[in-house]
Each structure stands twice: as C-alpha cells, then as structure tokens.
C-alpha cells in the first residue's frame, strides 16, 4: 500500500470520527434540553416562589405559579348563563338592597380587554355599582380616566385619586366601598353577609389583615379591602389633605400607605374572620390556601398574616369572600362552581342574619394569639386580641 493511499484512508477515518462526534454532540444537546424541560415542569410549584420585598407588592413577589396565569386573555365571547327555577334568593336580594356595595377595580388600559371585562361579566355584575379605575376611558367598561400615570410606582396615587373620585361622585350611592384588582374574584353575597351587622357610619375597614408596618395591621391590596362610608369620608376629607397623616407623593405600596392613613384618622382595621376563626379574604388562588404544604413556611406570607391560619379545608370560611391572582378563565370556572353547580338532594339552609350593631360597635374578635414574626421589618405581636 502506497504512502498516498495510507494518508487518504487516515483522512477518511478522521472525517468519519469527527462526523460521529458531531452527531453525538447534537444528540446530547437534544437529550439535555429535554431533561431540563422535564425537570422544570416536574418541580413543585413552591420552588418558584420569590422572596417578598416588603416595599414592593406585586406579582413577582407573591406565591403564584407562573403557569397559572398563562391563559390571560379569557374567552372572546360571553360564556352565557342560565337561571335556576327553584332557587330561593330572597335573603340575597334583601341584602342587595340593605347592604349596598360599590366595587371599584384597579386596572390599566392594557388590561381592559385582557382582564377587566371578565370581572364585569362575572362577579362584578353582583355589585350595586361597578367602576373601573384606569388612566384611559373605555366605552365597554365605562372606565374612569384618573389623572395619574400607570405603573407600579403610581398605584398609591391611583388609589388616592380613585377614592377622591368616589367621594365626589358616589359617596351616597353605597354603604360600603370595595377596592379590588382586575385579577381578584369576589363573592359579593358573602361580603354583604359579613357586613350586614355593621353600620356604614362606623369607621372601619375589612380585608386580609397583615401585621407589619402598621400598628393595628393593614389589609392586603390583592385580596381586596372594603371601607365603610365613614372610613372613606375620613380618608378623603381628613387624611389626604394632611401630609402628616397621609403620604402626599405617589410612591409606596398602596395597601400599606392607605393602612397608615386610615389608622391616623382612627379607622379601625376590622377582623373579617368568621365565628370559627377562618379567613374570608385571601391573597392567592384557592389552591394555595387549601393544599397543605403548598407554600414553604419560610415564605413571607406566614410572617405577614395577622392571625393564626390553618392549612387544608380549615384555612377558609364556608363564606369566603375573595381570592387573588385569578385568571380570566378561572373567573368563569369559579362562577360556575359557586352559582350553578349543585349536588342533588343537598339543600343548604343559610344561617340567620346577626343582630345589627350600633354605630361604632364591632363584633367581638376571636380570642386567640396573633401570629409572631422574626423577619426584618416585621413587628412581633403575640398579645391576645381584645374585644373591640
């Protein structure tokens, strides 16, 4: 065999070897990518939780899995509905007249079609009056264009302008005033039931109570909070004009800032739990509260929640009021499960309505220890709650 033929065979073998190496590399990359995808989608949801930044309340800081909000657009057409012929809604109709609730929804132009209209088509229609607060008008939503910019840094400013608008135009149209986000789902009938004994002239507000930053606690913005008419009056007339009582610039977390303002004008942070000590306002979707160990005990929520909270079915009142981070599609699912699905042969008899309270009087709080916290910036609080 000549030297030239040996050289040619050597080059050929080297080429085949390089080709096999290249193919092996490609196969390895494909397998590695597939394994990585499998690992990501099989990892428990709590691995995606982000640490909470107490000075920034937002999606990236909350215990909400990113995949839960993928289908944000919701249905293009109204899903429709039907009446229940034998349904007895006498009490709900009575409360609709006696406990008037104005619901205002924090939204923005990019969410008008994506989120806000689905609030209007589902739970929003059960409010006595529904108003969308944005920075641009919208004929379908009848949205109010507030004189404030969009973005997280303007949420406090938008909240102030919203309540000023409500006080000027609608203060006598309702007894209670609910603020909710465009991804909050609210069972309005249950809220009326909770509010029924209270006078709207009592300076009080209710929601999911957190304990840092404000001595008496403050209500989570995402879960929604509801102010009495007197609370709105004090906020707009007494707190907002006074920079010593209320932050004048637009920066800051809106739920914390309004909590400080309301405390400064002696509006009480009420206890919204039921008689069994179960919560009614929730900052996450039902799954996150109902499934034990869904959230790591080191997650910020457990340090922020004001009252001791159980996991599992005991987490939540049978008369729960709100959940947060609800996608548009989930709103229709919840609407069906709550207002249409019926187990045959089981009739739910509502509890008797409680007695009315005098102006300034509150229901006694559940006697128990408030939760403690050791996180930076979170005040420790373990004294037994007192009857107000």
Curated annotation (Swiss-Prot):
Alphabetic keyword roster: Disulfide bond, Glycoprotein, Glycosyltransferase, Manganese, Membrane, Metal-binding, Nucleotide-binding, Signal-anchor, Transferase, Transmembrane, Transmembrane helix
Binding of UDP, residues: 106, 108, 150-152, 158, 181, 324-325
Listed Basic and acidic residues bias regions: 378-388
Cytoplasmic side: 1-21
Membrane topology, record value: Single-pass type II membrane protein
Reported phenotype of the disruption mutant: Morphogenetic defects in which the ventral nerve cord is greatly elongated and the brain hemispheres are misshapen.
Lumenal topological intervals: 43-388
GO molecular function terms attached to this record: beta-1,3-galactosyltransferase activity; glycoprotein-N-acetylgalactosamine 3-beta-galactosyltransferase activity; manganese ion binding; nucleotide binding; protein homodimerization activity
Disulphide bridges: 103-127, 246-261, 315-316
Annotated transmembrane regions: 22-42
Cellular component GO terms held in the UniProt record: Golgi membrane; membrane
Entries under Gene3D superfamilies matching the protein: 3.90.550.50
Residues annotated as binding a glycoprotein: 300
Compartment(s): Membrane
Quaternary data: Homodimer; disulfide-linked.
Further details from the record: Binding of glycopeptide acceptor substrates to the enzyme is mainly driven by the GalNAc moiety while optimal binding and kinetic parameters are reached in the presence of both the GalNAc moiety and the substrate.
Protein name listed in UniProt: Glycoprotein-N-acetylgalactosamine 3-beta-galactosyltransferase 1
Gene: C1GalTA
């Amino acid at each position: 065999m000549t030297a030239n033929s040996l050289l040619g065979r050597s080059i050929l073998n080297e080429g085949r070897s390089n080709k096999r190496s290249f193919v092996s590399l490609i196969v390895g990359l494909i397998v590695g990518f597939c394994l990585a995808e499998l690992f990501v989608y099989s990892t428990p949801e709590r691995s995606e939780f982000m640490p909470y930044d107490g000075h920034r309340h937002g999606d990236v800081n909350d215990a909400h899995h990113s995949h839960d909000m993928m289908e944000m657009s919701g249905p293009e057409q109204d899903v429709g509905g039907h009446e229940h012929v034998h349904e007895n809604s006498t009490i709900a109709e009575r409360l609709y007249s006696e406990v008037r609730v104005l619901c205002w929804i924090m939204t923005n132009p990019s969410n008008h079609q994506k989120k806000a209209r689905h609030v209007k088509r589902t739970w929003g229609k059960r409010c006595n009056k529904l108003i969308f607060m944005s920075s641009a008008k919208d004929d379908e939503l009848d949205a109010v264009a507030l004189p404030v910019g969009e973005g997280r840094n303007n949420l406090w400013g938008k909240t102030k302008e919203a309540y000023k608008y409500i006080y000027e135009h609608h203060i006598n149209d309702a007894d209670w005033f609910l603020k909710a986000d465009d991804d909050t789902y609210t069972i309005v009938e249950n809220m009326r039931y909770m509010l029924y004994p209270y006078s709207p002239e009592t300076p009080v507000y209710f929601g999911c109570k957190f304990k840092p930053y404000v001595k008496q606690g403050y209500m989570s913005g995402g879960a929604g909070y509801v102010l009495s008419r007197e609370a709105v009056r004090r906020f707009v007339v007494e707190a907002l004009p006074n920079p010593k009582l209320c932050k004048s610039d637009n920066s800051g977390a809106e739920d914390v800032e309004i909590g400080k303002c309301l405390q400064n004008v002696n509006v009480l942070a009420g206890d919204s739990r039921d008689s069994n000590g179960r919560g009614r306002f929730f900052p996450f979707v039902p799954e996150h509260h109902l499934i034990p160990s869904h959230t790591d005990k080191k997650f910020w929520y457990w340090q922020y929640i004001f009252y001791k909270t159980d996991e599992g079915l005991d987490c939540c009142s049978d008369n729960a009021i709100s959940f947060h981070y609800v996608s548009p599609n989930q709103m229709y699912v919840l609407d069906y499960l709550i207002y249409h699905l019926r187990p045959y042969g089981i009739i739910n008899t509502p509890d008797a309505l409680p007695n009315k309270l005098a102006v300034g009087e509150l229901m006694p709080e559940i006697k128990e220890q408030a939760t403690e916290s050791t996180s930076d910036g979170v005040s420790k609080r373990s004294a037994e709650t007192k009857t107000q």
